């Protein structure tokens, strides 16, 4: 006699292993039930062990997924082995293809699970924007200088050689050279200006006057150029000197007159190198807004050249006709009060303001390196102009004599 429980088990086994039509539905039902049982057992295990370990959870979930795929593979193979006995080959093949497509879709779902990311999308976008801004910020000074060159306002020794050559060609037409000579003769007769020095000579001459940099930073001396720089900062609505604002600045207020911007920028470069530590620590608001490079070029360099102007033209006699000494008098150089005298500095400021045109037209087109003098003379010969009359060499020799 068969017990009730045994009969039920036989019926269940028959439902699972029968080759009759519809047995595939029973198999799917069993697979779904088995799947839920696996999840239930696994959830119970996770609740009792390592509930707070994300890495172990992920490992168990991965193993469960692999087990499910393996069970489905085995069940599918067993089912098709049974079905192949009762169905034609074409129907069996079609069923196999359908099952394989379903299996591939399930595997794709498992593979396409997104990885956990520490950064949110909005955080990533903000970082990208910040990096782009930093990269753009690095281009500001170069763009500003290049735009100023196009306006014939500025020349930087840091430009690439092709930029220098194109600018020199632009300023070397016959008409410009003739005009340059006219401007030179006019200003030399009116102000008795000193000769233009080459860059190495200029840096050697202005070196004793560079301590004014620290005195300006420490507020020990008032500065006309610092005053103009501070006004530009206060009138700005931006946190730093932008390209647009730089283009709108009146550079005549930040130019050391007859020395020209080309030599002024060379002095600014030297100041930035020598006083890098002081310029990067405890920066005043005006310096931060301008940036170290521009602050050195348009504030500290012209102030240094102002002191040098007082010495070169001997403004202590309140006359621009005094003969320029060849060497620095040590006694005067050691007395800052002499060069910091407000009356003397006002005389120098006025002279530099009155000779800005000379600096732009004459000084900035004169050779700044000694080897450039030969190029200048070759250009004069090409234009069939008298070398002795038009070259800058003549004015350096005549002035020294």
UniProtKB/Swiss-Prot annotation:
GO cellular component: cytoplasm; nucleus
InterPro entries reported for this sequence: RTC4 (IPR039024), RTC4_C (IPR028094)
Biased composition (Basic and acidic residues): 35-48
Keywords: Cytoplasm, Nucleus, Phosphoprotein
Location of the region described as Disordered in the Swiss-Prot/TrEMBL record: 35-59
Ranges in coiled-coil conformation: none
Compartmental location: Cytoplasm; Nucleus
Chain positions found as Phosphoserine: 23
Main location: cytoplasm
Family: Belongs to the RTC4 family.
Function: May be involved in a process influencing telomere capping.
Annotated protein name in UniProt: Restriction of telomere capping protein 4
């Amino acid at each position: 006699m068969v017990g009730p429980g045994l009969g039920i088990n036989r019926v269940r086994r028959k439902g699972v292993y029968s080759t009759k039509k519809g047995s595939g539905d029973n198999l799917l039902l069993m697979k779904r039930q088995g799947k839920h049982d696996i999840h239930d057992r696994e959830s119970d295990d996770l609740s009792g062990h390592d509930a707070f370990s994300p890495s172990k959870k992920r490992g168990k979930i991965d193993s469960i997924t692999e087990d499910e795929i393996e069970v489905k593979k085995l069940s599918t193979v067993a089912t098709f082995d049974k079905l192949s006995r009762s169905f034609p080959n074409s129907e069996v093949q079609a069923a196999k293809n359908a099952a394989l497509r379903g299996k591939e879709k399930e595997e794709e779902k498992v593979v396409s699970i997104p990885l956990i990311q520490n950064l949110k999308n909005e955080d990533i976008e903000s970082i990208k924007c910040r990096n782009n801004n930093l990269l753009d910020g690095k281009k500001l000074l170069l763009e500003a200088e290049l735009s100023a060159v196009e306006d014939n306002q500025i020349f930087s020794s840091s430009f690439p050689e092709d930029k220098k050559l194109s600018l020199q060609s632009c300023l070397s037409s016959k008409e410009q050279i003739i005009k340059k000579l006219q401007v030179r003769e006019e200003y030399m007769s009116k102000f008795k200006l000193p000769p233009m020095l080459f860059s190495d000579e200029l840096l050697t001459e202005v070196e004793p006057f560079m301590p004014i940099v620290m005195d300006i930073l420490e507020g020990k001396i008032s500065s006309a150029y610092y005053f103009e720089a501070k006004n530009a900062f206060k009138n700005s609505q931006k946190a730093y000197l932008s390209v647009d604002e730089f283009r709108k600045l009146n550079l005549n207020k930040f130019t050391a007159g007859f020395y020209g911007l080309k030599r002024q920028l060379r002095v600014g470069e030297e100041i930035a190198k020598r006083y890098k530590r002081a310029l990067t620590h405890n920066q005043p608001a005006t310096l931060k807004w301008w940036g170290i490079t521009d602050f050195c070029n348009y504030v500290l360099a012209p102030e240094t050249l102002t002191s040098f102007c007082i010495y070169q033209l001997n403004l202590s006699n309140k006359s621009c006709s005094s003969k320029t000494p060849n060497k620095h008098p040590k006694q005067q150089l050691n007395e800052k009060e002499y060069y910091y005298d407000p009356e003397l500095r006002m005389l120098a400021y006025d002279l530099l303001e009155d000779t800005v045109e000379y600096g732009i037209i004459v000084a900035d087109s004169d050779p700044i390196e000694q080897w450039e003098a030969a190029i200048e003379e070759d250009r004069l010969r090409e234009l069939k102009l008298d070398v002795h009359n038009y070259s800058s060499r003549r004015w350096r020799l005549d002035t020294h004599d």
